[in-house]
């Protein structure tokens, strides 16, 4: 079985090596196709990627947005399974083998999601209560639950490329919640399998999109929930979004106080 992993990157010199090595170090009974879509980086990203040119496909061109880069990479992909991993996130050891084994055990499965943790600039786990909460929701998947709250973590989500070709691709209209619209598109086609293993780590740092845009992210998610659901699920999503926004703000306040003390 062949897995295609796409990494969009622009000026990602700080973490790209860690991301690449977490992918290329994966071992198991599968074939890996790794495509890095660089948006004409002006830092040392391309020099770092050059070290791995024999083990991955590197495309460097202006793409306009991460969504466009991922869509382009998916068009190039030749694997049966697809995913993307952003240029600051990492796979856990054994992730791709777990994914392959799950799809083999469940041949009708079209997509799956697993557990994910949040890490800082130094790979240290942070915000454990949020991780626990989202991973707990993962046990109770239904389309309506997903409409009321986005609990699926992007770095730990994988799909059959046949499904990708049957849904709308990533929408550049959204700046922070484009993965959520993809989940809703996929949910309209098939029910995912929940893998009860840690598959990836999502890095939260000062330059990350989600770190600086969580208000925008939840507003976009609310719009998507209204588009794919009804008044009830949209209201529930609004309640849950406000709750999470305040939790994030409180965590930021506590973190700032800890730095000053």
Q: Which residue ranges define each predicted feature?
A:
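Short, acidic, metal-binding catalytic loop of nucleotide-sugar glycosyltransferases
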Residues: 21-31
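Short aromatic/hydrophobic "clamp" motif used to bind/position activated sugar donors
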Residues: 82
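Short beta-strand/loop segment that forms part of the nucleotide-sugar
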Residues: 31-40, 59-62
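Conserved nucleotide-sugar donor-binding catalytic segment
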Residues: 128-220
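Conserved donor NDP-sugar-binding/catalytic core segment of glycosyltransferases
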Residues: 90, 94-128
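Acidic helix N-cap motif at the loop->helix transition within catalytic regions
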Residues: 14-17, 43-51, 90, 94
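A conserved acidic beta->alpha catalytic loop
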Residues: 22, 38-47
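Glycine-rich, basic loop-to-helix element that forms the pyrophosphate-binding segment
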Residues: 61-77, 98
